[in-house]
Curated annotation (Swiss-Prot):
Family the UniProt entry places it in: Belongs to the glycosyl hydrolase 9 (cellulase E) family.
Protein name stated in the entry: Cellulose 1,4-beta-cellobiosidase
Pfam families from the UniProt entry: CBM_4_9 (PF02018), CelD_N (PF02927), Dockerin_1 (PF00404), Glyco_hydro_9 (PF00759)
Annotated source species: Acetivibrio thermocellus (strain ATCC 27405 / DSM 1237 / JCM 9322 / NBRC 103400 / NCIMB 10682 / NRRL B-4536 / VPI 7372)
Keywords: Carbohydrate metabolism, Cellulose degradation, Glycosidase, Hydrolase, Polysaccharide degradation, Secreted, Signal
């Protein structure tokens, strides 16, 4: 119904209540005369008149397919309703659902259920209020009777029930429309004026953290780094800014640089460049003294050399938490709330992973035919928010961790931090091996179990199963040891086999000096896999119902030339054999580092047109990094070309940064879908790995600056003022899509540990929650919701946390390394006279210096401006600079 809405959320700076529903969606109160008082209603959306339906959303299961929208009700101007389109009824009544989650029913309370529902075809609808997951207890369900709908006739239902069970915070209000309930498809079902009323319940006040006008890295900045903030303002003139310390004293001031409309966020923005301020301290913040708004400030942040010192260990700890087949326990878990029993070790109710069969051939999702056999595939890492274990996703993740170690070893810092024995908080610490290799080995040992033996199937011996996962999807709020689903092996794939060959070859060379027996076994199995892939070069993991199945992600890949190149690179660097050298040198991907995937072919179909260098499905860049990093027998000119290609790709991303209002290295995709893709944050992280290598190989600090910009975007300098990392920032990630760390599902589950990064904005609307909560015309950078049900924007995965760990470690440890021919990043090159930092010395620098001396609020590079090198910037420097520009002085500094 169409009624005036009023804001009901109290705005309190500095306090954020972790709640299930995003304030931008639920904070508006309807005043419908048809419904009871909003504040006593357990539902947050009742009338749909604002054009959104969240937290109502749909669910598809067991063959069901549907779509939904909020639409105008014909013949009722101003009235809107939630419309569900049943496209395929599926096998069961729950195959198609519309539902509202996040409901707590309290014992002894009496509730009034009310809704109006209608359809354009004769059908039935089963409505219930009950548990979201096992055992699916129902507290109200119209006495188990579905409602009959007559075409075009509205049915209004009003019933009471008393909660006679213990208080339950895992409830949902659900309508089932599939299976035997459905009409002939397609058809529409409409819902409006829906309520769940309890006069004893009062909606809590939700405290909403305002978005400040000045967006910053909410954690902080390294002292030597380039430092930018982004100001949201439609002003076309520079704005005065002040930087204050924790004592509220102004320590620096200047004027913003207007940039105009930022395409990806649709914000009008300015930049603040405060790179020359290097004084370490905590609690700095910006103010805009001439801007008359309640949000003319920034969040507090630090300037410190140890910004990433703890974060890198938190990022690495994610992998211990995601281990399968081992109890997660203290003192390694970081807190008792994050401990759990071992998952999938063949103990009831688990049905894996000690004796997992190939996928049942009589199942509709069987896919490629397989012989029947069983395998022990215990161990490894759970991939993401589910309990699946996927070789291609595990491949790039474990490569990234091992590459961290290999780079550290080559750069001479493998004797400290996570690289040394005892450096990480894991059970294997102090066992004589580098801890990060111990963690990687947990995945490598699992990989070995996924390889097909001669006994199992001689026709594909040496090939590797693409993945192992549940037969059907499980609900959120389920620990691994509670998973009751049967688990099966999906068919082998060439991509998985080459991931296996690449990472086991990499593992072999890193372990040869620590555990020669293990290293030799890795290499033997890697070479067997290589030969198997050559024999079966086109077993693709296709995106079909058989390949994806209902219990795990598909990870489809229809091109494997990149994986062949990557595997050949790793095998060649490890063995030096001509077989691999000849293969990689004849590959179309030889020495390639994509700046935008698919430009030269060779990208997984899903990656074509996306800015970035590599993903689980596009892997040639990994091989090129190995060739550029590790000593090998390639011609020196080729190795230099690989390094140059790495720098060239990074240069293109630096150009993107200068074009983007929030200074990030990706832009909207250049494919038919455009916008930001699933896991957009991970594209930035992988770009930052390449930027790190560009700095290693060139010594040019501009690549370090690019890494700083990427981190600042991820940690809050973005269109949503969102830190996408748990435990870090004023507005951190709180509700990732995960089956254990899901307090939105139930209070009995813990909030996530710190150091986990979410996939981030995805403008392709690939889950019902984001589709229900965010309008389709929302700018790409703002297509995100911090909600546990939004798997397409808020998922967490091993292949995203791996580059996050890589980058945070790199930035934390960069002061330990000076790259060949480079400069110490703490002592950046001084270009005397270049006051405005544009790389040139001319009259504009004299103007900038004069304005600075006259205290006109301009920021300059004071190191460059001190042209007589006396440690001060004053009128003497201005006089010398003018003489230099007039060619009266030949060299600066001039004393």
């Amino acid at each position: 119904m169409n009624f005036r809405r009023m804001l009901c959320a109290a705005i309190v700076l500095t306090i954020v209540l972790s709640i299930m529903l995003p304030s931008t969606v639920f904070a508006l109160e309807d005043k419908s005369p048809k419904l009871p008082d909003y504040k006593n209603d357990l539902l947050y959306e009742r009338t749909f008149d604002e054009g959104l339906c969240f937290p109502w959303h749909t669910c598809e299961d067991s063959g069901g397919k549907c779509d939904f929208a909020v639409v105008d009700v014909p013949g009722e101007p101003g009235n809107k309703a939630f419309r569900l389109t049943v496209i395929d009824k599926g096998q069961n009544k729950w195959s198609v659902q519309m539902r509202h989650r996040g409901i707590t029913l309290e014992q002894g309370h009496t509730y009034t259920v009310r809704f109006t529902i209608w359809s354009d075809k004769s059908c039935r609808v089963y409505a219930k209020i009950g548990q979201m997951g096992e055992p699916y207890t129902e507290y109200w369900n119209n006495n188990w009777n579905p409602f009959n709908l007559t075409p075009g006739q509205k049915l209004t239902v009003e019933q009471n029930f008393t909660m006679n069970y213990p208080t339950d915070d895992t409830c949902e209000f659900t309508f089932h429309l599939g299976g035997e309930l459905a009409a002939g498809t397609p058809y529409y079902v409409y819902l409006d004026d829906v309520s769940l009323y309890d006069p004893r319940f009062v909606k809590p006040v939700e405290y909403v953290l305002p978005q400040p006008d000045v967006r910053v890295n909410q954690v902080g900045y390294l002292p030597f780094a380039k430092k930018y903030a982004t100001v949201v303002s439609s002003s076309t003139s520079p704005l005065k800014w002040q930087l204050l310390n924790s004592a509220n004293q102004v320590v620096l001031e200047g004027n913003t640089i207007p940039k105009g409309l930022d395409k990806d966020s649709q914000d009008y923005v300015h930049w603040i460049d405060f790179s020359n301020f290097k004084t370490e301290g905590k609690g700095y913040y910006f103010k805009l003294p001439t801007v008359n708004s309640d949000t003319n400030y920034s969040h507090p942040f630090d300037i410190s050399a140890d910004i990433y010192s703890k974060m890198k260990f938190d990022a690495l700890a994610f992998f211990y938490h995601k281990r399968s087949g081992i109890p997660i326990e203290m003192p390694y878990a970081g807190g008792e709330q994050w401990t759990r029993p071992a998952g999938h070790i063949g103990v009831a109710p688990n049905k894996g992973d000690t004796n997992v069969p190939t996928w049942p051939q009589d199942d509709e999702y069987a896919g490629r035919p397989q012989k029947y056999y069983t395998k022990d595939v215990t161990g490894g890492w759970y991939d993401a928010g589910d309990h699946g274990k996927y070789v291609v996703n595990g491949g790039i993740a474990v490569w990234t961790l091992m590459n961290m170690y290999e780079r550290a070893k080559i750069r001479g810092i493998a004797n400290q931090g996570a690289y040394k024995d005892g450096g990480m908080n894991i059970p294997e610490r102090n066992n004589g091996y580098p801890d990060i290799l111990d963690e990687a080995r947990w995945e490598i040992e699992f990989f070995k179990k996924m390889q097909v033996t001669e006994k199992e199937d001689p026709s594909i011996a040496g090939m590797v199963h693409h993945k192992i996962h549940d037969f059907r999807w499980t609900a959120l709020g389920m620990l691994p040891h509670e998973d009751p689903q049967p688990r099966y092996l999906r068919p082998v794939s060439t991509a998985a086999t080459l991931n296996f060959a690449a990472t086991l070859a990499q593992s072999a060379r890193l372990w040869k000096d620590y555990d020669p027996t293990f290293a030799a076994d890795c290499l033997e199995k890697a070479e067997i896999a290589w030969q198997a892939a050559l024999k079966h070069p086109d077993i693709y993991a296709e995106y079909t119902p058989g390949s994806g199945g209902p219990g795990g992600g598909p990870y489809n890949d229809d091109y494997v030339g990149d994986e062949f190149y990557w595997a050949a690179c790793e095998l060649y660097v490890t063995t030096g054999k001509d077989e691999y050298k000849n293969y990689l040198m004849n590959s179309p991907h030889y020495l390639e580092m994509p700046a935008k995937m698919g430009e030269n072919g060779g990208a997984n179909g899903e990656d074509n047109g996306l800015w970035g260098c590599f993903t689980w499905g596009t892997t040639q860049g990994l091989g090129t990094i190995t060739l550029a990093l590790v000593e090998n027998g390639l011609p020196s000119a080729d190795i230099q070309k690989a390094r140059n290609n790495i720098a060239k790709a990074a240069d293109k991303w630096l150009e993107n940064i200068e074009e983007q209002g929030y200074r990030l290295p990706i832009k909207q995709a250049e494919d038919e879908r455009g916008g930001y893709p699933w896991g957009s944050n991970s594209f930035i992280l992988n770009q930052m790995i390449v930027m790190g290598y560009a700095y290693d190989f060139t010594g040019n600090s501009k690549y370090l600056d690019g890494m700083q910009d990427g981190m600042s975007y991820l940690l809050g300098r973005n269109g949503l003022d969102q830190s996408y990392v748990t435990g870090y920032g004023e507005r951190p990630l709180q509700n990732p899509h995960d089956r254990f760390w899901t307090p939105q599902t139930s209070k009995k589950f813990p909030a996530p540990p710190p150091g986990i990064i979410a996939g981030g904005p995805n403008s392709r609307f690939e889950d019902p929650t984001i589709t229900a909560a965010v309008k389709k015309d929302t700018p790409p950078q703002k297509c995100y919701i911090d909600h546990t049900d939004s798997w397409s924007t808020n998922e967490i995965t091993i292949n995203w946390n791996a580059p996050f760990a890589w980058v945070t470690a790199y930035l934390d440890e960069i002061d330990l390394i000076t790259p060949p021919g480079g400069v110490d990043p703490e002592e950046p090159e001084v270009i005397y006279g270049d006051c405005n930092g544009d790389g040139k010395v001319n009259s504009t620098d004299a103007v900038a210096l004069k304005r600075y001396i006259l205290r006109s609020g301009i920021s300059i590079n004071t190191d460059n401006a001190d042209v007589n090198a006396d440690g001060r910037v004053n009128s003497t420097d201005l006089a010398i600079l003018k003489r230099y520009i007039l060619k009266e002085i030949d060299v600066l500094p001039h004393k």
